[in-house]
Amino acid sequence: MVRLFAPPCLRRVRTLEEEGYIQGYRGLLDPQRLGFEVTVFASVHLSSQADADLRAFEDFVRGEPLVRECWMLSGDVDFILKCVAPDMATFQEFVSHLTAAPHVRNVRTSLVLHNSKYAAAVPLELKVSD
């Protein structure tokens, strides 16, 4: 354990921010308490993997508030999206909008029944040795 007083600690934090180790600060909100009852993972297959088409899809997703995370994958699926919605009807409207997006060949969705683990941080204990 490192004991630092406020000024040295703040300098260390500022250095970590400047070097890009700390990317930002966020509050961890409970989606259900805020009325987002539905969490869904959507696997998206595109009709083209040309760079311009991949970027166009990413730009489309950035403008969609129900999409909380978007990951480009290797293998059978081009992208996986983590989405939240207040109800299934709202999510279904989004899926209709998503399937009509340029270059989207098909979308498969999986409704989350239960979250067994959520870890927002990286496992520093596996990398850091003091």
Task: Go through each PLM region and give its residues.
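A compositional/biophysical signature of low hydrophobicity enriched in polar/charged and small residues
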Residues: M1-D130
